[in-house]
Amino acid sequence: MKAFKLKNGLSVYIWEDESKSDVFGLVGVRAGSINDPEEYTGLAHYLEHVMFKGTDKIGALNWTEEEPIYKEIIAKYDQMAEEADPAKKEAISKEINELTVKAGKLGLPNEYSNLMESMGAKGVNAGTYYDWTFYHSSFPAYQINKWLEISSQRFLHPAVSYTHLRA
């Protein structure tokens, strides 16, 4: 096995297995259920699924139109967290739901997985543990640059819509 660290701090491990024609790629991060806030257990696992669904380009039909809606949703969640009145919280929650449905009409569900599978990837999956989360698949060696680009995009430009959350 070869191990090295990139300038950005990313650790890379390469193990050649000449008996296999495909490459097994895995991206892991040091975050898991230990990082869940006490009141939101399961959040790391939920984020694993969210990160699997799309980016500003993968699964987004019109990110220029979607992005302001997501920013408004985030602002509404912040507003709801600060609101003490239960009736006002409920009204904000309804606004969030309406915005989420509106945004959901602008995205494609499962586009990330479909894109990976279209390049020959198999076993596209992920897992969340106590202190780490990973995403992996096997793919034809000639697709390594495409796999690296697609895999990096989920961390660089994640985007989530209502249709992604339902999937």
Model-inferred region functions:
Residues M1-G107, F134-A159, R166:
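His/Glu-rich zincin catalytic helix
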Residues E16, V124-T128:
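Catalytic zinc-binding patch centered on the HExxH motif and its immediate surroundings
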Residues G127-D131, Y162-L165:
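Short coil/turn segments at secondary-structure boundaries
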